[in-house]
């Protein structure tokens, strides 16, 4: 069953598209419901003869005729001009702990104004937000939130950052970019949670206006990406390299799924690659899988598997390796690589202690990389 079919069957079974989503709660209070679709000209595409276009935003390079949409479902060719249909059309808006993203080396203990529009340029069979990521914009309730309004709302709410999250922010590139520009003017940082399927040119443009990027490295084989992500590993690795070489902070998350991507030889290869291509100080999070969407036949990841993955990554020289989605686990903490003491103590999303002084371990003075202020 494809993603559209799954949505249709869910609707037929009486499941609301909003069920199970991150709560809209008070985040959307005061925002007016607008027309479901925007019509703002997209960036990163070329016009072709006969009113065709080719999208250059992500590696799919969708070539589209008049009135056709890209794979993401949120960008449409109308008369030979390509438009984003979700500019300022927010379907999820919350204030989250930054640790939920997860970012562990960015402003610990603070909150991020977290937003999303509909759409995604891959189709992960284990997606936790499939109701909005795999929907077209007409299928979700959206509210108008202009870039300047989003930036002002973050500042007024005491959020030092805006997170582009929940779905795939690449597909609302224009909105994310413009919001990040306005947020920076107000002293609000921008953090991106992405699967990494973006072409080099738009990525370079984005890296000029955001502060941190978390890449979901969903596996370490093309076979896994083809079967379970409907994407490709190669562009994700290229994205990680590019972010690591920029001035933007990088963290990596690996969702470890039993029997699908939990081979320890691949974990070792992945850890070596991260060490060599992104650097030993890039934080890596091995997180626990929960049955979701189209992969409900597998159990949650054993904690012992996550611990083994972390142990291998440390053996290969990575300095900051975490176990995620296991609240209370000791490997949620940040340990100083110099003296071994806990420098950031966490329980779930809560921060119990931060033992840093000007970005250095209070005990031994070892510099700890990250965005601390």
Residue ranges and their predicted role:
Residues 349-356:
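Short linker/helix segments within small regulatory modules
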Residues 31-54, 60-116, 131, 342-344:
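N-terminal [4Fe-4S]-dependent radical SAM core
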């Amino acid at each position: 069953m494809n993603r559209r079919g799954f949505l249709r069957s869910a609707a037929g079974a009486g499941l609301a598209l909003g069920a199970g989503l991150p709560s809209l709660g008070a985040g959307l209070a005061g925002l007016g419901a607008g027309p479901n679709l925007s019509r703002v000209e997209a960036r990163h595409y070329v016009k072709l003869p006969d009113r065709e276009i080719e999208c250059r935003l992500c590696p799919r390079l969708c070539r589209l005729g008049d009135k056709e949409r890209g794979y993401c479902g949120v960008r449409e060719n109308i008369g030979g001009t390509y438009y984003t249909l979700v500019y300022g059309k927010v379907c999820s808006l919350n204030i989250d702990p930054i640790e939920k993203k997860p970012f562990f080396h960015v402003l610990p203990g603070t909150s991020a104004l977290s937003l999303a529009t509909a759409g995604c340029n891959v189709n992960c069979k284990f997606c936790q937000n499939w109701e909005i990521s795999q929907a077209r914009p007409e299928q979700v309730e959206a509210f108008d939130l202009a870039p300047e309004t989003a930036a002002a709302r973050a500042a007024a709410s005491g959020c030092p950052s805006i997170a582009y999250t929940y779905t795939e922010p690449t597909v609302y590139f224009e909105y994310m970019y413009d919001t990040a520009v306005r947020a920076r003017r107000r002293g609000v940082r921008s953090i991106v949670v992405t699967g990494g399927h973006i072409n080099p040119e738009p990525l370079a443009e984005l890296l000029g206006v955001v502060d941190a990027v978390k890449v979901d490295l969903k596996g370490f084989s093309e076979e896994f990406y083809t079967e379970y992500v409907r994407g490709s590993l190669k562009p994700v690795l290229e994205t990680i390299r590019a972010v690591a070489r920029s001035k933007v902070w990088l963290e990596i998350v690996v969702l470890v799924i039993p029997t699908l991507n939990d081979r320890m030889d691949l974990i070792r290869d992945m850890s070596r690659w991260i060490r060599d291509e992104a650097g030993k100080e890039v934080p890596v999070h091995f997180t626990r899988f929960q049955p979701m969407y189209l992969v409900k036949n597998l159990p949650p990841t054993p904690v012992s598997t996550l611990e083994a993955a972390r142990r291998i990554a440390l053996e290969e020289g990575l300095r900051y390796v975490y176990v995620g989605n296991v609240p209370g686990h000791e490997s949620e903490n940040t340990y100083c690589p110099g003296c071994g003491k806990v420098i950031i103590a966490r329980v779930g999303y809560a921060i119990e202690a931060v033992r840093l002084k000007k970005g250095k371990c209070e005990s031994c003075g070892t510099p700890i990389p990250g965005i601390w202020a």
